Amino acid sequence: MVNPYKYFGGIITEILELAKPGVHYGKPFSSLLPLREEKTLTSREWMRTAYMYGFFVRATTAYNHKGYWKFQGSRSAGYTEDGTFLKGIALLPYLKKMGIDTVYSLPITKYSQRFKKGEMPSPYAVKSFTEIEPSYKDSLLQGFSVEDEFAAFVEAAHILGMRVLLDFVPRTAARDSDLILQHPNWFYWIRAEAAERYQAPKIENLGFCQPSIDNLRTIYSAPETKRLLGYFTESPDKLNPQVWENFYKDSVGKGNDFLESLIDLFGVLPPPGFSDWINDPQPAWSDVTFLKLFLKPPNLSREFVDPNQSPYILFDIIKASNFENDSANRPLWEYLVDVIPSYQRRFGIDGIRLDMGHALPRALESAIIQKARELDPGFVFIAEELEISKDKKALEHGYDAILGNAWWMEPRVDEGKCYEFCQKLLPGLKLPALVSAETPDTPRALARPYQKRFAKFSFILNLFLPNGITFLNSGFEIGEIQPLNLGLDNTEEGRFVLPKNNPMYGKIAFFDHFTFQWDKPDDEMFQLVLSAAPLKSECKHWCHTDNLLEGYFTPSDKIIAHLYKHPVQNQALIILANTDFHSGNWISVDVASIPELKIGGVKREYEDYRKTNRYLNMDNGYIHIFLEPGEATILTIR
């Protein structure tokens, strides 16, 4: 048995012993740097060499503390089984040992209990933009708020030398958002009786594509579009101002579920969201609705609708970044622009992944980024941009990195996509991209073809890719195979990858009670991740595109090969990865020709995913390396 107070107390004491006197670790990490590093205070360059761990508070630190029956996410015997910030603090030293320097969390905002897709709400169904999800408070702690506990988490991370990034969702909200009572005009509304029939219109004369100026007429002339527009109505405060005033007085500040009463009184409700891609087969986003960023349709779309048409949602309105619109809903914009700064001021967070930022109107996107940087010039933004060809655009818009599509390209080793992505596409990017074979939305690496072999391959490969930000999806390091969500590159069958007798069989963390297999970790995977920490920490700061050298490898269309030379010290690093999972391959490296490098020895850091200390023999200035099928390795030269 573990005494939780001794356990947590011991970890917290160890962290606090590392704190420097007089330093306020609740401020942004960039403000904590020594004065001699003043140039880095305004620099966001740290992002491109970050080693990032992504987690979902509710699931990553969830555990069956009662020790019997099944995990239910309950609060029993004084314990909170679902994840909490307190348990997150206990996880930080574990991440530090893995070499992690940046932690990224899925949304921590208060989520809605309505329109759930499973046992639990999605973290993206944001009920309050400024409140933290109350269930993330640990029942072991008395006299502290959930805000206190998150602040402590950020401080602990900063003490350990880690930055904290959050996910921000400025485009959608829960369909029973707390903002509805104060600002019903910030939402779209449909008649309640039409809710069952509401769905994205199918446009017969178009394929799977995005809305554009060229296809607007086709979109609006479609019969299903006309049907959809007929479902919309005015906001309830306009339908009956007096009844709304009374309803508002009865509901505001009481913390009760007001949506049912609103539907009964006015016969309206916010509609579910759907994709901005035309003819997208994915179902409606039943737990969220779009915020009304504009009071009118896009300028070019107005000719296609009746002047008396109620505000509505359609592809061109969702993809607001593609269409000019002179009717900004200014009070809503001002509110959204100040959400991130509120977290900066209260908690000292260090960056944001901007959900659906690519669909925001350019002026709003720019204002959000600018306001955050006014408070902290070192504050970073990651664009949820899956097309790496949009890297230049993301850079121009002020982002520091893009999500990218490594999760799609890397698993397709047999199709040559992994080689294409890592060898040809990444080095030329204008912005770094996250590199990982899995994300919270995709299948796990262990569930891909070649399973554990591929998971090991992808881990070593992604440690030192040019323009690649190494990203670990929580659970990867202990061999998790169950996906957290089915949103990308997956099917409904993807939820059934565990044995049927496993308590998590068929469960999805985004929507169900969920816990990792902490009691049965894959020690082989964990030891591999742990073994890379010293090398990653030592070399990450100089293994980037500024120090990338080309032309020293024998040609290969199967082996990914990159070489970095330290700009000052007598040191180089080589990453090699055989994308052929059926045959071994040789590659030779002309190390003697590397400029300004005195070769004392060439060390192979890994051999078939075992840490080694083997030095390679040179042959007329070359080294020759054989890579087993699906093997990745690292060479260091000193």
Question: Could you say what each language-model-derived stretch is?
Answer:
Residues R58-L86, A125-E147, R175, D316-L332, ...:
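The substrate-binding groove and active-site-proximal loops of carbohydrate-active enzymes
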Residues Y51-Y53, V103-S105, V164-L166, I352, ...:
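Hydrophobic faces of well-ordered beta-strands that scaffold small-molecule active sites
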Residues F85-G99, K110, Y124-F129, E133, ...:
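Glycan-processing catalytic domains of CAZymes
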Residues M1-S31, K202-N240, W244-W277, Q282, ...:
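Active-site-proximal helices and loops of the catalytic beta/alpha 8
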Residues I11, I15, R453-R604:
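Loop/helix patches that line or flank the sugar-binding groove of alpha-linked glycan CAZymes
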Residues Y615-R638:
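C-terminal beta-strand-rich structural cap/linker in extracellular carbohydrate-active enzymes
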Residues M1-R163, R171-A173, S177-A284, G630-I634, ...:
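N-terminal structural segment of carbohydrate-active enzymes
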Residues F55, L95, S105, F129, ...:
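Conserved, mostly hydrophobic/aromatic
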